[in-house]
């Protein structure tokens, strides 16, 4: 990809899954990469897996002060942040009628408020510097209806509209896009689905499989590169054809 060598990239939720694969991909492209994650064991594991990292920083993204401190530390480690991969998120599989106020608040706080905190702090930094790219992890859950994830779905739809609004306000200095993966075989997915459930999902996807985290990472790398210099305000699905069929593919 053109223009990624030497870019300073901060990946949130970067200790596992899509985040870890994305951190690895940017390192392959010659970027300087810092990973943000709240999980201490995860941060230690990713440091061992990717020794070329510029560093790791800790933060609960739902806490504004922690986000500010972590972003400042990432800037200290790398000198600046040119690209933000705003990826941290959680999900809970539960029936809509049984969602507690505490569960609702937790998912909203991490997946939407946390994305806003990180995006706003990074955007101020980038506007001051005159350029930057913010890429956010949405989901096909924010595009199609899915049962048992009402709170998660609401946050991902929110991320999509936040992305569009940011792109309009931050242009021309800062580009903002979202990536909306479909089913991705990540540790979070494995924890929530049995083997039988995973296979049932595969049969609903036209390509008959889950995405690999590395495939999502490749799209992030492209969108951050000079090859995508005219891309902003867009949501890019990578879902094996899932949304092409709408309800028919569910």
Task: List the predicted regions and their residue ranges.
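C-terminal helical subdomain
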Residues: 178, 199-227, 231, 238-240
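Active-site loop immediately N-terminal to the catalytic Tyr-X3-Lys motif
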Residues: 97, 144-150, 208, 226
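Active-site helix of classical SDR
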Residues: 119, 155, 163
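Residue(s) in the substrate-gating loop at a strand-loop-helix junction
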Residues: 139
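Substrate-binding pocket helix/loop in short-chain dehydrogenase/reductase
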Residues: 95-96, 103-108, 134, 201
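Alpha-helical segment proximal to the catalytic Tyr-Lys
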Residues: 124, 167-172, 229
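Short C-terminal tail/terminal secondary-structure segment
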Residues: 144, 232-250
């Amino acid at each position: 990809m053109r223009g990624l060598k030497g870019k300073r990239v901060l990946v949130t939720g970067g200790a596992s899954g899509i985040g870890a694969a994305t951190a690895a991909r940017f390192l392959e492209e010659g970027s300087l990469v810092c990973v943000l994650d709240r999980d201490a064991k995860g941060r230690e594991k990713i440091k061992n897996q990717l020794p070329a990292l510029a560093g790791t920083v800790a933060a609960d993204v739902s806490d504004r002060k922690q986000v500010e401190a972590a972003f400042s530390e990432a800037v200290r480690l790398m000198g600046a942040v040119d690209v933000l991969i705003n990826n941290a998120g959680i999900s809970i599989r539960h029936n809509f009628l049984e969602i507690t106020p505490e569960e609702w608040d937790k998912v909203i706080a991490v997946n939407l408020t946390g994305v806003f905190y990180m995006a706003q702090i990074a955007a101020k930094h980038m506007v001051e510097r005159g350029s930057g790219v913010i890429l956010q992890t949405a989901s096909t859950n924010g595009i199609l209806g899915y049962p048992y994830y009402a709170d998660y779905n609401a946050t991902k739809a929110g991320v999509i509209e936040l992305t569009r609004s940011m792109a309009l306000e931050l242009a021309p200095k800062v580009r903002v896009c979202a990536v909306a993966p479909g089913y991705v075989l990540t540790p979070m997915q494995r924890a929530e689905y049995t083997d039988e459930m995973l296979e049932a999902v595969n049969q609903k996807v036209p390509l008959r499989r889950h995405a690999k985290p590395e495939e999502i990472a490749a799209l992030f790398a492209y969108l951050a590169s000079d090859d995508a210099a005219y891309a902003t305000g867009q949501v890019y699905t990578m879902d094996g054809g899932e949304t092409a069929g709408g309800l028919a593919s569910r």
